Amino acid sequence: MEERPSETNSNVDSSAQPSVAQLAGRFREHAAVARETPASKPTRRKPPCSLPLFPPKVELGQNGEEKSPSGASHPPKIKVKSSPLIEKLQANLAFDPAALLPGASPKSPGLKAIVSPFHSPPSTPSSPGIRSHPSEAEEVPVSFDQPPEGTHLPSYNKVRTRGSIKRRPPSRRFRRSQSDCGDFRDYRAVEPSQENGAREENGDDVFASKSKDPGSPQLNQEAMADGVEGTPWSAEKPRRRNTCNSTEKPEELVRTPEEANAGEKVGQNPDTASQGHPEVQAPSQTGSPEAENGCGSPREETTPGEHTDTGKATEGTASEERVADEDRLGQKSPDANMPEEEGVVREKAPQTSSGKAEGTTIAEPDTKQKEEAPLEPSCSPGADHAAGEITSEIQNEKAVSMDDIPIEDTRM
């Protein structure tokens, strides 16, 4: 490393002796500058330093060997004086980072530092080490920082937003669809439930009348002793039955004669049919007028059907008690006479149905609708109270006959 600059110094001295023969004193003064020229020799490869040195050489061959170099040697030396200072500063600037890496002497890395930025072969050992680290430093954030920024972070956001988009609207759609479907299901469920509710209420009336039979003494005491207290219970049921839709009326009207016909089919003999038909007809009649009127109490409707079992003697007592109770409450007499007419018509109906075809029973509800239409104004606690007392007396007399009715016949 140190042999090359020594050889260059000897070459510079040999070449400078003939050129500085006339000006030996000046050359000795500038001997230090001549020794510093090895730093300028590598710089001759640079374009700015090489341009002023070549034209004096051309002048040496044309004009004269001694004159031209004297005039030509001084200006380039002056230029060299200014250049090495700048080159030293540049070499120091380029030398400080390069000197730390190899750890060599300050002179030789200084030469390499000057040569390195302009020549690829010497620059390859130093520059790749310098460039590799920043490239790695640049590549490391690219490899680790960009993936979370470019791929992972947007993917997390996208996944969350997509998940939210996939979750929320379906939930709202499902809620709306379920609410719509639920509304349709509610309407569909309410219609059969109301129909079933009307049937169950009809059945509850039958079971209530039957449940009163075994426990008749307690209910009869409450109805006879405290007749006014029995009216709220009879008045509550008509209010609850007002909720039945009008669409259910024809279905129940069609079913009531079918139930009556089923009661006829169960009876083997015409005598048993005539006995079982009015009893089965009574609960079926309780359902149809309740759905039609919505005000008629079950006790009002069960009494005329049960009059058929007792006969004309019970009708007379029932009519007298009704007239007495209605006179107390100030009701009209034609409303009280209507149930008696219904009882007479219902007495005639089972007799004709036992001997005639089933068409007579189907014609009965039409006549009942016409007769029960004027019964709507008679919806009052007085009529309910009167009906409650009559049913209590009749249930005492015919408790055994009502117990004999099978449950399946009423629910056909």
UniProtKB/Swiss-Prot annotation:
Gene Ontology molecular functions: actin filament binding
Cited InterPro entries: FAM21/CAPZIP, RCSD
Regions of compositional bias (Basic and acidic residues) in chain numbering: 248-258, 298-312, 319-330
Residues recorded as bearing Phosphoserine in the entry: 68, 82-83, 105, 108, 116, 120, 123, 126-127, 135, 143, 177, 179, 216, 297, 333, 401
UniProt xrefs under Pfam families: CAP-ZIP_m, RCSD
Oligomeric and partner information: Interacts with CAPZA2 and CAPZB.
Name of the protein in question: CapZ-interacting protein
Gene from which this protein is expressed: Rcsd1
